[in-house]
């Protein structure tokens, strides 16, 4: 009997499913807030925006008057075919106030993988310039090339859920600080689940848990020393003591961000020149 029970135990271990990662975006009808945090006050997170259709579904960070940095997994096929169906709410701590501006174009990183979550980064261009340099509306400072967050406390903000699976909507923006986790420690924690690449870094209270970003926080910024070093990407649950949250490492994408913004400007110039020539030739004839 003991041998039979032992064999049953071995079979159960062999076929046990590893934990699955959860992308920290909500469906487009759900909302929520930071795990283990407190309400933000004016000036805490002026880079923070809410991405919305009919309601909040992801976060993002202002990086210039016309550009928002967010996570690639926040964007779906409908968004790409109809960018104008998405709005950015900024200059607010409250989801019911602030300023709404429509999205003009969306750029998802060409090598983003929804299987590995590598290159989980995207850019949104707004139809009009945002009115910045206000208490709750300031462009985030980008890090230097090669910046690799491995030590210190991340500052996170957002409207993500209190617990994994929650759908409770907060009134105000939440904030929390979370200690960074060494990449090798993080990689070991995620062994057999997902590969932690050089394009990612991790943060969480290993062995303790309780503070983290969660569903609805995806795409929001991870700040370190007042620089936008990361984008909220994925984790196993939220605030799990065994699995730190994983963030896209912004310093790996500075060239991509610059080229993407330039290509949009080049396209706009080309369109304007074509329109001018069309009108000019039409006037002559």
Curated annotation (Swiss-Prot):
GO BP of this protein: proteolysis
The enzyme's E.C. designation: 3.4.21.4
Subcellular location: Secreted
Presence of keyword Cytoplasm: no
Gene Ontology CC terms: extracellular region
Source organism superkingdom: Eukaryota
InterPro entries cross-referenced by the UniProt entry: Peptidase_S1 (IPR050430), Peptidase_S1_PA (IPR009003), Peptidase_S1_PA_chymotrypsin (IPR043504), Peptidase_S1A (IPR001314), Trypsin_dom (IPR001254), TRYPSIN_HIS (IPR018114)
Ligase is among the record's keywords: no
Leader sequence segment: 1-16
GO molecular function terms noted in the UniProt entry: serine-type endopeptidase activity
Class in the EC hierarchy, top level: hydrolase
Catalytic activity: Preferential cleavage: Arg-|-Xaa, Lys-|-Xaa
Peptidase S1 domain segment(s): 34-262
Active-site residues, Swiss-Prot/TrEMBL: 73, 120, 218
Activity control mechanisms: Inhibited by the serine protease inhibitor phenylmethylsulfonyl, and trypsin inhibitors soybean trypsin inhibitor and tosyllysine chloromethyl ketone. Not inhibited by dithiothreitol, a cysteine protease inhibitor.
Keywords: Allergen, Disulfide bond, Hydrolase, Protease, Secreted, Serine protease, Signal, Zymogen
Site (Required for specificity) location in chain: 212
Pro-sequence residue ranges: 17-33
Coiled coil segments of this chain: none
SMART domains recorded: Tryp_SPc
Family of the protein in this entry: Belongs to the peptidase S1 family.
PANTHER family attached to this UniProt entry: FI18310P1-RELATED, POLYSERASE-RELATED
The protein's name: Trypsin Tyr p 3.0101
Source organism (scientific name): Tyrophagus putrescentiae
């Amino acid at each position: 009997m003991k041998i039979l029970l032992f064999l049953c135990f071995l079979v159960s271990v062999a076929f046990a499913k590893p934990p699955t990662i959860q992308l920290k975006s909500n469906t487009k009808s759900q909302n929520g807030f930071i795990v283990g945090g407190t309400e933000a006050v004016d000036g805490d997170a002026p880079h923070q925006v809410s991405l919305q259709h009919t309601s909040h579904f992801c976060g993002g960070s202002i990086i210039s008057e016309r550009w928002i940095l967010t996570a690639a997994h926040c964007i779906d096929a409908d968004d790409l075919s109809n960018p104008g169906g998405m709005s950015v709410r900024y200059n607010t701590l409250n989801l019911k106030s602030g300023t709404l501006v429509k999205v003009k174009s969306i750029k998802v990183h060409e090598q983003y993988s929804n299987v590995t979550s590598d290159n989980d980064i995207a850019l949104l261009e707004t139809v009009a310039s945002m009115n910045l340099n206000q208490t709750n509306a300031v462009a985030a400072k980008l890090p230097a090339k090669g910046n690799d967050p491995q030590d210190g406390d991340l500052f996170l903000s957002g409207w993500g859920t209190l617990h994994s699976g929650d759908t409770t909507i907060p009134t105000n923006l939440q904030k929390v600080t979370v200690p960074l986790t060494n990449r090798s420690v993080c990689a070991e924690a995620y062994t057999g689940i997902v590969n932690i690449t050089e394009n990612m870094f991790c943060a969480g209270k290993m062995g303790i848990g309780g503070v983290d970003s969660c569903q609805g926080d995806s795409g929001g910024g991870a700040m370190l020393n007042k620089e936008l070093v990361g984008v909220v990407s994925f984790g196993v649950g939220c605030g799990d003591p065994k699995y730190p949250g994983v963030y896209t490492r912004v310093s790996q994408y500075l060239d991509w961000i610059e080229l993407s913004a330039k290509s949009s400007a080049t396209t706009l110039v080309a369109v304007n020149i074509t329109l001018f020539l069309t009108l000019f030739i039409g006037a002559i004839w």
